[in-house]
Amino acid sequence: MANYFIDRPVFAWVLAIIMMLAGGLAIMNLPVAQYPQIAPPTITVSATYPGADAQTVEDSVTQVIEQNMNGLDGLMYMSSTSDAAGNASITLTFETGTSPDIAQVQVQNKLQLAMPSLPEAVQQQGISVDKSSSNILMVAAFISDNGSLNQYDIADYVASNIKDPLSRTAGVGSVQLFGSEYAMRIWLDPQKLNKYNLVPSDVISQIKVQNNQISGGQLGGMPQAADQQLNASIIVQTRLQTPEEFGKILLKVQQDGSQVLLRDVARVELGAEDYSTVARYNGKPAAGIAIKLATGANALDTSRAVKEELNRLSAYFPASLKTVYPYDTTPFIKISIQEVFKTLVEAIILVFLVMYLFLQNFRATIIPTIAVPVVILGTFAILSAVGFTINTLTMFGMVLAIGLLVDDAIVVVENVERVIAEDKLPPKEATHKSMGQIQRALVGIAVVLSAVFMPMAFMSGATGEIYRQFSITLISSMLLSVFVAMSLTPALCATILKAAPEGGHKPNALFARFNTLFEKSTQHYTDSTRSLLRCTGRYMVVYLLICAGMAVLFLRTPTSFLPEEDQGVFMTTAQLPSGATMVNTTKVLQQVTDYYLTKEKNNVQSVFTVGGFGFSGQGQNNGLAFISLKPWSERVGEENSVTAIIQRAMIALSSINKAVVFPFNLPAVAELGTASGFDMELLDNGNLGHEKLTQARNELLSLAAQSPNQVIGVRPNGLEDTPMFKVNVNAAKAEAMGVALSDINQTISTAFGSSYVNDFLNQGRVKKVYVQAGTPFRMLPDNINQWYVRNASGTMAPLSAYSSTEWTYGSPRLERYNGIPSMEILGEAAAGKSTGDAMKFMADLVAKLPAGVGYSWTGLSYQEALSSNQAPALYAISLVVVFLALAALYESWSIPFSVMLVVPLGVVGALLATDLRGLSNDVYFQVGLLTTIGLSAKNAILIVEFAVEMMQKEGKTPVEAIIEAARMRLRPILMTSLAFILGVLPLVISHGAGSGAQNAVGTGVMGGMFAATVLAIYFVPVFFVVVEHLFARFKKA
């Protein structure tokens, strides 16, 4: 093939230009993302049982739905929560690659089977089945510049005018409002109700009657008289609109003819529909909307669309209303991709300089440089064809590919230059001869490297998706690189290179010194190799010791899934003791805000807090803060990284009394959890009951707290059992007094909860009407005695006459995992430990708990456990495939052994570099390790290929052949290896956005390549001679 293109250079150029055009078009159309669709798709089923406590919801709703979710294709695990507000949520997580649409349809079909078994009140409320991500993409906050709008004004405007348009924006899965729109609030006074012989149900029924939209029909409607001349709509009654109009609702007419109006027994006002959350931006009243990404949607596109929509809507905002973004994960995605692009350019420049240093000929150097954009753009075209995106993983693959793809072109150019110099041939003839010598080696390198990366494409789960991105990117670039090295590169060599002048090229002073030094080094290397081959047994023992060291390093290197990143944002949770009020929670959140805005003012840009909300559940004792940091360019230095900021905050905020305040970083993959660290589900496998499971959980937390050198921040991601005020109704006594149980329940529910009645019109929008006891009449236990129920004879009877009260404890939020009662435990690895170490430590602690208590990993930890199980198989398959590929290529069993023995030399370098830098054995390291395996084998192939050829064609002995081959190939091996090492150097020294991933990939590969080069050039000749002798003996035997 090479000879064909040497004679047709224009054709070679045409193919290269077509590849570049295709790649250019692909780049313009490829979507950009931080990661591909790594996270498995999730489907969430949400239901509401009004008035039910957590246990009732779990027994009558959650379990009924769970028990019908069997036989779903690709279901990995299922988690659920039931809370005291009557809410049930079941989240089903499916295998990566499962179609979210099909999963949603299957879940809906299974839900239909459960519907007849659910309470009627649940069915009336409706059950939703959503496919949005559980994680927050961004938060838009709304504030009043001059303070003219209070938090309820802001929240009402946002709920009425902004929430719905945003929820319809492309890519948005769901939105969550931090605040509430207005509602008509009817605050009842029990003493006045009793005075007029009224109960809450009377008020509700009259509101329903008098605040109603009636369809009055028409005058002159069809069918009509033949001479009918009039047609008009009849308006009978419309909905009320103001508190004054509601206050005039007639409740009853007394015997003396006087009227009792709603305002006589209640205070009527325009208030919030929901008072459960309080939002603040930098301590000022605010409202917010959390945007959650639709499953499979692109984060950057969605964020852009949301901001464009808000910008459009801002033209209609009240004068003082302003939008800010206190939490946005997309700037990190943009900047991290830009950083990798920058790394790509830096790698190309460094590779060019290395090639120029060794080739010392601009014409020769420009040829491999031309191959770089051709192959890279061609790879983008392939990525587009297979449906990939421009993301961190594919860009890392490109950076690694630069060192690989110039290798082929360097090998071609270097050998052509050698043939021109040694054989005094013109460039075209020299290129023909050179390609005959190295064509098989190029194919061998391509086969080996493709064989290394191919098994990665068949791994499963989120880890498999990461491997697949690297695999397809690297294999595509490698195959294109070999094609270019056998088409465009020889054509360029034949046309661009010049014949060697008499006496050879005259290098400048710098190159002359380099050449002199290199020639001396080459001679020293040749002499050293000859010495090594006289005592191969000794050096095989050294090799075995290196292998033993590799095994020790493997066991010593901590494991994790993905490295943590400084994403420019993080969160802080605050949890107060059970029963704490919103007033206390708001004060704690203000302390958190003050700390970040004063002690960390050089790093923190804004703080947005939400009282009453947390990932562990909703409640007055819960709070969450979204902290946005200043740009990375303004936070230079390790002390200003998110990790350092969190560590300082953890110490400072631990001093806040009567609250557990915990700052935490975001997970590497947003859709796989809400926090970094580990995520464990403690399971009640033995059906021990809620109390025993709580005791086991507390024991686990106590054991974990005793080992701060292993794990830190171990905490339950749930709500503690809270005091509950139980009203025991004596049904027999109530019946004897003529009081209906339904009336008792209605009175208690309305007074101490609230009752939704119907709707009213406010500023052209339909809003809700609620009836509830006034604040003074539902604050204390004694308030229960202020409420009366009318009996069958019309007499008012106090609740205390037929009921008793007592204090008890109960859970406001119950959890289940795969249909088993559970409690979620979150935590972080201690300094110097990886999440893999922390997970193993926690698993050992669970083994000390009472029988019947088990555990399971979920979220990011589930994927980490899965990846650690797959890694050994991946390494083994890759090595076997490489061995078989070499055996098939060389029609020999001995040559593959000579090549494969070099692999541990690269691996020990990768492990040593990773260990010295304090990094862990994560997915990026594993990809780097496979790259190291391929590159180690490549260097060995370059030497062994020439040795075999000399043995076959010139009849040399194995020792003579391998010494000469090693001498001849030393220069291209060092050149390609140094080019690759410097190509990944920008990854190793990267800092700022995305540096965690860049360091993880670059460090292992650089260390592995350095060791593989320095050690392999000495050990490959030893391996070759030892293997040839062993196989020769075997054949004789």
Curated annotation (Swiss-Prot):
It is a multi-pass membrane protein. Its main location: membrane. The keyword Cell division does not apply. GO terms for biological process: response to antibiotic. Residues 1-9, 360-369, 414-440, 493-534, 892, 949-972, 1028-1037 are cytoplasmic. It is found in: Cell inner membrane. The chain crosses the membrane at residues 10-30, 339-359, 370-390, 393-413, 441-461, 472-492, 535-555, 871-891, 893-913, 928-948, 973-993, 1007-1027. Residues 31-338, 391-392, 462-471, 556-870, 914-927, 994-1006 are periplasmic. It comes from the Bacteria. Keywords: Antibiotic resistance, Cell inner membrane, Cell membrane, Membrane, Transmembrane, Transmembrane helix, Transport. It holds the Pfam family ACR_tran. Coiled coil: none annotated. GO terms for molecular function: efflux transmembrane transporter activity; xenobiotic transmembrane transporter activity. The keyword S-adenosyl-L-methionine does not apply. GO terms for cellular component: plasma membrane. InterPro entries: AcrB_DN_DC_subdom, Acrflvin-R, MdtF-like. Belongs to the resistance-nodulation-cell division (RND) (TC 2.A.6) family. Part of the tripartite efflux system MdtEF-TolC, which confers resistance to various compounds. Homotrimer. Part of the tripartite efflux system MdtEF-TolC, which is composed of an inner membrane transporter, MdtF, a membrane fusion protein, MdtE, and an outer membrane component, TolC. The complex forms a large protein conduit and can translocate molecules across both the inner and outer membranes. PANTHER family: MULTIDRUG EFFLUX PUMP SUBUNIT ACRB-RELATED (PTHR32063:SF13), PTHR32063. This is Multidrug resistance protein MdtF. The gene is mdtF.
